[in-house]
Each structure stands twice: as C-alpha cells, then as structure tokens.
C-alpha cells in the first residue's frame, strides 16, 4: 500500500518560502524593536536642560521643588534686562538638578547686591567650581558655570557667595547628597548669577 504525499510529510516550496519570509520579518521586528527601545531608554536618561529665558517664571514658581533654595532669586525678570542667560535641569535618576539665571545690572546695583550677599554668605570663594570649592579645607559644594559661554569653571573675577549648603549624605559619604545655593557676582562685568543645586 502506497501513501499519498501530504503537506505534513513533504512541505511544498510555497510553504517553505512563507516560513522563510515570516522568520525574516520576525528577525527584523526584533532588531528594529530593540533599537527603538534602546533609544527610548537612553534618551530618558539624559537630563533635559532648559535655556529658554521665557520659561523663567514657570521654573521659578512651579518647577523648582524647594522654594527656600531660590527665595533669593528675582521673582521675575524685569523688561529691558540685557544679556539674560538661563540654565535649568530637573535632573533624572542619579543626576542632580540645578537652576541658574545670569543677569547684567548697573554697577550701583551690583555693589548693593555684593554688600547684601557678602553679609549673608556662609562661605566665600573666588572663581573655580563645585569640585574646587568642595575640596578646599572646610569647603562645600557650590555650582558649575552653567550659564557661561566656554567653561564650567568661574573665572577669578567672580565672587561665589554660598548662602547655604546642606550635607544630606550618610556617614562616610560626605556630600553624597545635599543642596547648596547662593550667588556669583562679577563686579567688573556688572553681572550676577543666582544659583541653586540639588544632588
């Protein structure tokens, strides 16, 4: 007795072609899907940095979580203020957040602000950045020059006045977490930078 060939015993060329096509599309789908998934995950790990000065009021009054840390910031940017620069990052996951606004003022206003903030400052530095300041004897973390054009470190013409710095790290991990805020003033350029950091 002879058995007649069926699809189960001898698949036709058409079935083989369909199987190859399905496996190929499945592979492309897996590779493509993993690419887009990786892009979505990696882009969500990058902190958003906002530099649009028109969003200052929103950041100042709604987005920054601790109003005590920015109570020294202006409530709004006056019309006609020149050379305003802003840098805000809400931070994600393990990165810290920061907020800086850089303003040009009249020399008289700068002198008044310098006198006012020198009296309030708990720590004072000349130029540098947070890494330099934190590693000085009795130093505290400050900020980087986020609103600068070329460097992350303040030039020596800037006086960095720390109004408060709070260590929230665990024993043995000094300054692992914390916050600091203050101003950086360049009298020669008639500029003031209001800053706050949280990590």
Region annotations inferred by a language model:
Residues 2-30, 34:
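N-terminal Sec-pathway targeting helices
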Residues 1, 81, 101-103, 183, ...:
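Generic structural hydrophobic/aromatic packing signal, biased to beta-strands
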Residues 129-199:
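Extracytoplasmic electrostatic interaction patches
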């Amino acid at each position: 007795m002879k058995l007649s060939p069926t699809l189960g015993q001898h698949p036709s060329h058409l079935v083989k072609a369909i199987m190859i096509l399905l496996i190929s599309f499945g592979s492309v789908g897996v590779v493509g899907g993993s690419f887009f998934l990786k892009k979505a995950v990696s882009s969500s790990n990058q902190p958003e940095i906002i530099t649009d000065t028109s969003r200052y009021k929103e950041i100042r009054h709604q987005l920054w979580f601790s109003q005590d840390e920015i109570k020294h910031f202006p409530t709004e940017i006056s019309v006609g203020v020149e050379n305003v620069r802003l840098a805000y990052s809400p931070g994600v996951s393990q990165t810290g957040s920061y907020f800086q606004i850089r303003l040009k003022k009249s020399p008289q206003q700068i002198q008044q602000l310098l006198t006012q903030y020198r009296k309030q400052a708990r720590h004072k530095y000349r130029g540098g950045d947070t890494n330099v300041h934190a590693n000085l004897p009795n130093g505290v973390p400050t900020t980087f020059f986020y609103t600068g054009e070329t460097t992350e470190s303040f030039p020596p013409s800037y006086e960095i006045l720390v109004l408060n710095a709070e260590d929230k790290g665990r024993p043995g991990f000094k300054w692992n977490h914390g916050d600091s805020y203050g101003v950086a003033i360049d009298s020669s350029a008639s500029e003031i930078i209001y800053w706050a950091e949280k990590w």
